[in-house]
Every structure is written in structure tokens, then in C-alpha cells.
């Protein structure tokens, strides 16, 4: 009985298969017929269009169509890169600092020469420089003033407004769209920057830095959308941004990132991995009088008419020029005391960070008002951003750290630690709660 049922089912399946084949042939013939009909109609339509055009040569529409067809093809002019005519090479450190201080003064801000040297050394030596502070402390305007002082603001400065919800590098560098077969630009200003630097490197005419400002950079986790560039922090001399279609942009250390971040609870934390690679400058609060009077205004300041060359900036402020120098023993002892103290708070200062501090100091000591001031800037911007802990024991560690800073005339660092202690809530202490 079961065998008979199986045989019946097989026969039924065979009949259905034959029917499917017959249906398939029927549909195939129908499709072929439709294709033939389409070709016939299409040919007839083309014939009628040609006949109509022949009989209506004087009509306005035909004249327009013919004129368009007879127009010569436009010649596409290649964008030939040329050398900068306003490039400034014969300038020394004092002159650059004087220009910077003047631009700040024009904007209603006063900075010391030490501050000016600090900004310049930080930007030249580091791949990304972070300006941290409360909203309204002038972080963004400071970055714009730096670009204007160096003559970069009009053509070699891109301001990127970071938004919430950025989750990958696509939000910054764009992506290849397989439907349009084109690179979709999510940040046009940055895409323009990459194209320009790629062309300059291909033609070997890189003459000036290009500053990219990530404004309110921690509205989204930086490590997510900046992942393409995190790799190049140690050696930015050959950077590559690649897309899935094989297209890529290549450029070098002329690209410098600036970032502004706010101290509040609505932003993403900076990871230890990022802090190990970045240089963080803490911004002092702006006085109420200055804010109310509206004296601070970077928009009234014009871009410097001359562009300070990349070669000049590197020759003056880069650490490679002092790589054979060594930190003096007194300064090394001071630094070692700070590093050892940080270990008590659970913070191991990496070899990378120590190298960055050393590089900064060896250049800064030549220009700043004292060796102590040079070391003070380095510690406050490379070591203190690591501060993040809680409890009575951590408070004792911070008090001890502040004492060491005071004993070694590291006044800026001592002041920062003091503010961290003052602003703590529920015995939670963080550099980014200043």
C-alpha cells in the first residue's frame, strides 16, 4: 500500500514538472513576442521622429536641438596646481609669535608669549591637539585665530561640526556608493581637504599645513568616527584613506587636526587610548566682563596675508631638530617624580607619552620664560588629562600630586589639580570636570 502511494506521488510530480516546463515555454514565447513588438514600436517611433524633424527644420524646437547637437564639445580644463605666491619662509620664531599675539589682540584676547609658543609647538609636533573647557571659553575662536595668524584660514582650514550619532569613519570621510558608483561625501569640506592634499602630494608641491577643526568633537565618541586616523598618530608622514572601489587619497604630516571638547555630562568620554595619542590644552574660563562687553570676536580679524610655510614651522618648532639633545638631569628628576606619583593613583604613563613630553620640552625650553614653565605646560597637557578616579584614597593621591607640583614650581599643573579637588562631586575627581 505504501509503495503504491509513493508511485502515485512520483507520477503526480512528473506530470506537474511537465506542466511547469510547458508553462515555461509558453511564458518564454510570450516574452520573445513582447520584445519583438517593443523593437518594432521603437523603430517606428524613431522613423517618425526623423520624418518629423525633416519636415520641421524651421521650427524653434528643432533649431534648438540642432544648435545643441552642433555645439563644440567643452574642453575640460585641468586643475593645474601652482606654487603659493604668498608663502612666507624667511621668518623666525619671534616674528611668528608676534603675529599670533597681534591677531589675538585684534579679537579682544590677550595671551602671553609662553601661551603663543605653547600653541605653536603643540600643533606642529602633534597630529591632533585638543582644546578642552566649558562652553563659551573661546575654544573654537582660538582655533580660527591660530589659522588666521598662520595665513591658513581662507584656503587651508576646514571646520567640521561634529554631530551626535556619528558611529564610524563614514561620517567623516564618506563612503563608496555602489548604486551611483561614486564616493558619497558626508563632510564636503573634509573631502575637499583630502582631494587637495592628495593632488599636492602627487605633484610634490606640499608647501603649507592644512588645519582641520573637529568642533565639539566629543558629541560622538572620537575613536569611532576618527578611526581612520588614529593609526597615524605615531607616524603621519604617509596617510591613506581608502574606499571599497579601490579609490584612495594619500597625504602626509601637513594635515593637522584640532579638536574642541566641552566639559559637561552630555558628551562622550575620551578613552585612555585616545588620550595617550592626543595633546590636551585646558582652556581657562573667560571673565564675565569680557563676555558681557562682547569684546571677544574672532570674526573681525582678517586672515594673515602671508602663509607661514610648513618647512619653516617644522624647522622652528618640530622636535626632529633637537633629537640629539637630552633633558637636563634636574628636569628629568622632576618629571620622574610626577610619573612615579601618577602610578600611585593607578595611572601608568606610557612610553609614547613620555616621548611626546620630552620632544615638547626640548623645543619649548629654548623659547619659554623658564625651564620650569616649559615642563609645566607639558605635564599639564599630557599627564594631568589622565586624572580620573574616586574615593578618599584618590583624593590623598591628588593632594600629594599637587604638593609635588608646587615644590617643583609647576604652578599651572598645581592650579589644575587644585581645581579638580575643588570641583569634585561625591568624591569623584576628573580632569574633564574642570
Describe the residue ranges of each PLM region:
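C-terminal regulatory/interaction module of P-loop NTP-utilizing enzymes
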Residues: 1-434
